[in-house]
């Protein structure tokens, strides 16, 4: 069974790493600071039991989670990127956690009058009753997280 608090802490540690991309770079990843997250992810994959964990020259992190059944099953891959847009800062991310979202406006930043409202983003209502992780209005972070109860792996 998943430990919700550990997942939340892990996610928050990821979003606090500045991974802002550089549009003028001709390398992949476009900044050295993106390697920090790649290395962290690789270490954590090893810690939860994945094998063949590696980071290639482009900072792609790969690993294998061995099957836990005897019969042949299809393989699955999860692919994502960890750079963030240079259009807004990725430094000093200050996530806000909204437990048991009530379907009302979420004040991201009272001082700047930044509000996330289902009046403008009606898909927010799909997440009523769930935990939301949002920006404080000063960075790009806006993630809706839904923690389910998969059977593997134990995190």
Model-derived features: where do they sit?
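A short glycine/serine-rich beta->alpha loop
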Residues: 133-143
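Single conserved hydrophobic/aromatic residue that forms the stacking wall/gate
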Residues: 145-149, 153-155
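Conserved acidic functional residues
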Residues: 81, 143-144
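Acidic/His- and Gly-rich active-site-bordering loop/insert found
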Residues: 3-134
């Amino acid at each position: 069974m998943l430990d919700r608090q550990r997942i939340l802490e892990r996610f928050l540690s990821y979003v606090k790493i500045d991974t802002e991309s550089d549009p003028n770079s001709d390398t992949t990843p476009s900044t050295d600071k993106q390697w920090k997250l790649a290395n962290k992810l690789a270490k954590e994959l090893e810690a939860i039991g994945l094998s063949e964990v590696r980071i290639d020259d482009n900072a792609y992190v790969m690993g294998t989670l061995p099957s836990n059944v005897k019969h042949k099953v299809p393989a699955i891959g999860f692919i994502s990127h960890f750079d963030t847009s240079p259009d807004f800062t990725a430094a000093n991310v200050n996530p806000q956690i909204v437990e048991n979202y009530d379907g009302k406006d979420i004040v991201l930043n009272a001082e700047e009058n930044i509000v996330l409202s289902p009046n403008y983003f009606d898909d927010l209502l799909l997440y009523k009753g769930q935990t939301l992780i949002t920006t404080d209005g000063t960075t790009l972070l806006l993630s809706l997280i839904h923690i389910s109860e998969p059977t593997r792996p134990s995190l």
